[in-house]
């Protein structure tokens, strides 16, 4: 669960939160929608999950109101079940490199 509309952001603010999980990011409209929601909430940062992957995570991370991204592409269930931890290590290292490239 997470925020996916302005009413949810308002509720988070009522609880004193300034960082909210935004879910499901891509099905809800992606970065364009997050930017539209974020505009009036200048003190709120977002952590999108849901549809984030190696192909689109860079664009999310370039937006200064994104504090972090979640993505299951790095640790898929089939990789865990098959014990393919080397692939998980490779994918998480790639994700960390993307973060370092964008955020320093």
What residue spans do the PLM features occupy?
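Catalytic cores of alpha/beta
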Residues: 7-15, 38, 52-68
């Amino acid at each position: 669960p997470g925020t996916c509309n302005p009413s949810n952001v308002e509720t988070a603010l009522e609880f004193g939160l300034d960082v909210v999980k935004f879910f499901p990011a891509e099905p809800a409209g992606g970065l364009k929608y997050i930017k539209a929601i974020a505009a009036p909430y200048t003190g709120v940062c977002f952590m999108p999950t849901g549809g984030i992957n190696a192909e689109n995570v860079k664009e999310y991370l370039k937006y200064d109101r994104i504090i972090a991204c979640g993505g299951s592409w790095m640790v898929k269930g089939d990789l865990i079940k098959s014990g393919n931890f080397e692939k998980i290590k490779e994918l998480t290292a790639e994700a960390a490199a993307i973060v370092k490239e964008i955020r320093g």
